[in-house]
């Protein structure tokens, strides 16, 4: 049994910009760390560059390297938008024809901010072609659970249920913002103890009711400075 070859084109789609961005970062890192790597990485705005221009870039032979990486944002959404007409249809047809034939050194990454349908022709092509790869990055249904898992896996720190729920209430499905807040909270507690709801209230713009609760808790446990910070947030 032969292994599937390394993909030459990828479709990363979905609302989870954080995890999607991490997947793109891994492909960047795979280009190597020498000075030639940046010479073989190009980025395009799919609303500006044409499919022909993008294909020309990704099929250009790499300079002193064995790979060329081209990253394109929102191309498919642009080609299939309302009003794209014959130009959009022609662009999709061009991609369907050319993507399976990309040379082995090509690494084309199509990034879409919205989740694509399983019936999308290019998604189906990426999933069925030996040289294609498609992955959806949907926002988790349980943001509180995601925050707790992220804190443990990425920062080796615990965040209690109420703190995670409070943070999830503030950040919603914006996982990038949630992760940024986790970094702040990790530094705030110096990685020495679990993150509490009072910590979230002290550092994060938060619902007033929770700030009041956290302030009372801080006063009751002798944390006067933290209680004062929370009082200023309420004023």
Q: Positions of the model-derived regions?
A:
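Conserved beta/loop motifs at nucleotide-recognition and modification sites
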Residues: 1-235
């Amino acid at each position: 049994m032969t292994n599937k070859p390394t993909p030459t084109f990828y479709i990363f789609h979905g609302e989870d910009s954080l995890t999607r961005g991490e997947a793109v970062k891994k492909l960047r890192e795979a280009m190597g760390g020498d000075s030639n790597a940046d010479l073989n990485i190009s980025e395009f705005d799919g609303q500006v560059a044409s499919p022909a221009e993008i294909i020309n870039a990704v099929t250009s032979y790499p300079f002193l390297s064995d790979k060329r990486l081209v990253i394109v944002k929102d191309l498919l959404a642009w080609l299939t938008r309302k009003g794209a007409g014959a130009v959009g249809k022609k662009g999709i047809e061009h991609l369907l024809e050319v993507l399976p034939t990309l040379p082995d050194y090509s690494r084309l990454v199509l990034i879409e901010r919205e989740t694509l349908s399983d019936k999308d022709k290019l998604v189906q092509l990426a999933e069925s072609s030996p040289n294609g790869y498609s992955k959806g990055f949907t926002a988790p249904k349980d943001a509180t659970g995601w925050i707790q898992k992220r804190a443990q896996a990425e920062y080796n720190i615990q965040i209690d249920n109420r703190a995670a729920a409070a943070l999830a209430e503030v950040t919603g499905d914006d996982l990038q913002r949630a992760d940024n807040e986790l970094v702040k909270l990790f530094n705030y507690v110096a990685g020495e103890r679990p993150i509490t709801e009072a910590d979230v209230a002290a550092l994060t713009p938060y619902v007033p009711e929770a700030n009041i609760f956290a302030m009372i808790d801080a006063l009751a446990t002798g944390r006067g400075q933290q209680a004062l910070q929370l009082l200023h947030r309420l004023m």
